[in-house]
């Protein structure tokens, strides 16, 4: 064991994260919440979809709502490139795809190298942030995946998913026209 590994052990439990870039900042997500990282693909836009949803993709038969983190974080839109990735994550037992500018690597940050979030980190409110990890000469903003979406947005996603399942033809959604929930469906849902 080298001195760096001993130092990491002394700092406590290692946090394994997928690191990625949005705008000028590097972020990290708990690797256990990430299902996979894929290249950007065609996103099917949905009429009347909630504003935070870019659209949906079909990933091996699963319809996954897509959220662009640039939009979510209030950053200027940027055309997708060959480095653009979709990180598929589990949010409250639902798969959601998050578009990022680039996915970097798996990083390990000792618990002792993670500080509480500052009042504002990378222009983000601390509601999304779990902490800031120090890794060599850089800082990684650790996102709290459960707070990326508000409770209202999670309800909207569930309604959208229900509507998609109800309108999907037998045999799946491949090639089918899919509609987002109408305002009537949204308004007739249970109050939260």
Predicted regions and their residues:
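An acidic, low-aromatic, low-complexity terminal/linker signal
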Residues: 1-192
């Amino acid at each position: 064991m080298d001195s760096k590994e001993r130092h990491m052990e002394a700092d406590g439990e290692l946090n394994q994260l997928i690191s990625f870039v949005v705008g000028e900042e590097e972020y990290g997500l708990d690797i256990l919440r990430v299902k996979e990282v894929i290249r950007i693909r065609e996103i099917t836009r949905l009429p009347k979809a909630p504003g935070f949803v870019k659209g949906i993709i079909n990933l091996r038969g699963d319809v996954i709502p897509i959220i662009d983190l640039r939009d979510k974080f209030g950053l200027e839109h940027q055309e997708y490139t060959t480095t653009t990735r979709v990180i598929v994550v589990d949010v409250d037992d639902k798969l959601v795809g998050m578009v990022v500018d680039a996915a970097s690597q798996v990083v390990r940050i000792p618990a002792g190298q993670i500080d509480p979030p500052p009042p504002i980190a990378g222009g983000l409110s601390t509601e999304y942030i779990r902490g800031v990890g120090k890794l060599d000469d850089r800082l990684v903003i650790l996102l709290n995946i459960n707070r990326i979406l508000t409770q209202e947005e999670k309800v909207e996603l569930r309604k959208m998913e229900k509507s998609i399942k109800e309108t999907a033809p037998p045999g799946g959604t491949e090639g089918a026209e899919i509609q987002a929930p109408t305002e009537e469906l949204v308004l007739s849902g249970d109050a939260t």
